[in-house]
Amino acid sequence: MNNADELTLDLPNFTGPLDLLLHLIRSQKIDIYDIPIAKITGQYLANLARWQTLDLQIAGEYFVMASTLLRIKSQYLLPKNDFVEEDQYQEDPRAELVEQLVQYSVFQRIAEYFKKRDEEMPITVAKDPSVSPKKKVEPLPLGEITSDELANTFKVVLERFKLRKPQVGQIEVHEASIEEMTTFLKDKLHHRKSTSFFDCIKNFQDLDQVIGLFLAVLELCRDHKILVKQNRDFGDLELEKVETNGK
């Protein structure tokens, strides 16, 4: 590896191997769907070697990822099967890793959004609830589904949402898009009590819209405006309007 390819990074700055890989990709503006696996593997291993020379405690998951990268790299070094037709589809050895990176990037953006929201939230003074006592709202914001179940279902949504491939560096969480999706969802629930998440996204054209709707669902759950229910694991999400004061 030449000096131009070396990226010296500090271990404490990363939460795990996917975080490190994503940083290497973003910092060099690499297309995540066309990762130069030899180059990235070399940079990844160079950083692990440097951390070891500094006697840093490196989690085992970093070495697991290293073996994964080396396995993918080795697959590119193997001779191609001459008996396979040129136009016959062969799965890209990087496909599974790319999927993990895309999913990690999406959830990273979501986490960053809520962290920013918490930091920007102004100090508020508590007041008596305006909701009628007869219409008690349960304190659990996600209704009959847990946060982990909701996150796992969203992973399934990402896998099923086979649209144009977004550049990871371009996946953004915009306040405006969340407001638009909040309005979109409220309009959906204006004349009926419930709708489904899959029904809402069926005509969406890009991943940003799906992320925006997901965040809008979380916002409305937190504000006790809707409940989220699920009839089976990884199934569709039923979004139900919470009626207060008879409205």
Curated annotation (Swiss-Prot):
Pfam families: SMC_ScpA. It is found in: Cytoplasm. One of its GO terms (biological process) is cell division. Its main location: cytoplasm. Coiled coil: none annotated. One of its GO terms (cellular component) is cytoplasm. InterPro entries: ScpA (IPR003768). Keywords: Cell cycle, Cell division, Chromosome partition, Cytoplasm. PANTHER family: SEGREGATION AND CONDENSATION PROTEIN A. Participates in chromosomal partition during cell division. May act via the formation of a condensin-like complex containing Smc and ScpB that pull DNA away from mid-cell into both cell halves. Component of a cohesin-like complex composed of ScpA, ScpB and the Smc homodimer, in which ScpA and ScpB bind to the head domain of Smc. The presence of the three proteins is required for the association of the complex with DNA. Belongs to the ScpA family. This is Segregation and condensation protein A. It comes from Lactobacillus gasseri (strain ATCC 33323 / DSM 20243 / BCRC 14619 / CIP 102991 / JCM 1131 / KCTC 3163 / NCIMB 11718 / NCTC 13722 / AM63).
